[in-house]
């Protein structure tokens, strides 16, 4: 990994400026009361202007919003790589591979559910390292097995792990073995050759938290699925909060899991977020609450060591949340949901 020419001061200053332009609670309250056309007009008056103007002649309503959100997200993250040099560039590029992982899981889920490829394409985020050609090839796959074969043939880091997990998927009939293989591969490459020093110690701590929360999500997803699968077998190495055995136990008792987090190093920073987790009455709400907790935690780390990669990662998470929220509001409005129902759909 390159260690010379890193420029955290410059990148952090640019990121802070971008962060200040993110939508706040007042703007979300406005969006909830708007039609999709009104949401698009408001977006045109903000950082999404370029995308709305470029796409406005071809799309309208929710389609326009969806495409503008995804293109803006990719542009914002391309800017991060354009600004960064040396070691900082390497760290950001590795983290942004999360969108390759997202796209692999999105394609697999789409094939599994029989969703039209055009609809699956709408949910892809082209902000990682996968080329458009590779993503289009995956969208054309006629089966999950074929998609896995294409990932292997393209030499991606996910191919061999997915091939190893395919038999477990075939036997269980649930996607968890495949999704877990993607997550494990992603985090393995993130942690590989990561030299921990003053500039990266907080980043390593954040990655531990992200892995801890991913393990918690996976454990509860397994418990909800009813599949005869041991959660310990799908434990992701690299966290600090759970052992594989403890995770298998917590999968059966959410209160014990929450209490374990409260008593951990995360407890003081996440008291409010943990209250949200405690009151979540569905798996989706539970996962959203965990995502909120992770974002809240990343914010605290960014202030501890501002001249590192951590503020950049915190911005990436915040930008993702903004895009997810605007998308949820637009889709909810199109589906005829009430204001209160829409508010439950975003973070």
Curated annotation (Swiss-Prot):
Keywords: ATP synthesis, Cell membrane, Hydrogen ion transport, Ion transport, Membrane, Transport. Pfam families: vATP-synt_AC39. It is a peripheral membrane protein. GO terms for cellular component: plasma membrane; proton-transporting V-type ATPase, V0 domain. GO terms for molecular function: ATP binding; proton-transporting ATP synthase activity, rotational mechanism; proton-transporting ATPase activity, rotational mechanism. The keyword Transit peptide does not apply. Its main location: membrane. It comes from the Archaea. It is found in: Cell membrane. InterPro entries: ATPase_csu/dsu_sf, ATPase_V0-cplx_csu, ATPase_V0-cplx_csu/dsu, V-ATPase_V0D/AC39_subunit, V-type_ATPase_csu/dsu, V-type_ATPase_csu/dsu_dom_3. One of its GO terms (biological process) is proton motive force-driven plasma membrane ATP synthesis. Component of the A-type ATP synthase that produces ATP from ADP in the presence of a proton gradient across the membrane. PANTHER family: V-TYPE ATP SYNTHASE SUBUNIT C (PTHR38682:SF1). HAMAP family: ATP_synth_C_arch. Has multiple subunits with at least A(3), B(3), C, D, E, F, H, I and proteolipid K(x). Belongs to the V-ATPase V0D/AC39 subunit family. This is A-type ATP synthase subunit C. It comes from Haloquadratum walsbyi (strain DSM 16790 / HBSQ001).
């Amino acid at each position: 990994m390159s260690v010379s020419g890193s420029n955290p001061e410059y990148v952090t200053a640019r990121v802070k400026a971008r962060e200040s332009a993110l939508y706040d609670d007042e703007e979300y309250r406005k969006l909830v009361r708007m039609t999709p056309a009104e949401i698009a007009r408001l977006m045109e008056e903000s950082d999404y202007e370029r995308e709305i103007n470029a796409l406005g002649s071809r799309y309208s309503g929710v389609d326009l919003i969806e495409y503008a959100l995804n293109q803006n997200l990719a542009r914002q993250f391309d800017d991060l790589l354009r600004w960064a040099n040396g070691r900082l560039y390497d760290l950001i590029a590795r983290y942004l591979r999360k969108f390759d992982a997202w796209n692999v899981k999105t394609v697999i889920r789409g094939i599994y559910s029989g969703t039209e490829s055009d609809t699956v394409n709408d949910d892809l985020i082209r902000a990682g390292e996968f080329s458009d050609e590779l993503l289009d090839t995956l969208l054309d796959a006629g089966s999950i097995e074929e998609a896995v074969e294409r990932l292997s043939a393209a030499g991606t880091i996910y191919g061999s792990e997915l091939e190893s997990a395919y038999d477990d998927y075939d036997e269980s009939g649930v996607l968890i073995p495949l999704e877990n293989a993607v997550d494990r591969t992603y985090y393995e490459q993130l942690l590989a050759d990561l030299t921990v020093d003053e500039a990266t110690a907080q980043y390593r701590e954040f990655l531990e938290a992200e892995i801890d929360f991913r393990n918690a999500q996976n454990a509860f997803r397994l418990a909800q699925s009813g599949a005869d699968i041991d959660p310990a077998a799908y434990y992701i190495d690299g966290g600090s909060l759970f052992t594989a055995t403890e995770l298998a136990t917590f999968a059966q008792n959410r209160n014990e899991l929450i209490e374990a987090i409260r008593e951990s190093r995360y407890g003081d920073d996440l008291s409010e977020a943990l209250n949200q987790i405690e009151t979540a009455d569905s798996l989706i709400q539970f996962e959203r609450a965990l995502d909120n907790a992770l974002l809240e935690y990343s914010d605290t780390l960014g202030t501890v060591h501002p001249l590192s990669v951590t503020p950049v990662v915190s911005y990436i998470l915040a930008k993702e949340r903004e895009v997810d929220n605007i998308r949820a509001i637009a889709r909810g409005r199109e589906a005829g949901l009430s204001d209160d129902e829409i508010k439950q759909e975003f973070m």
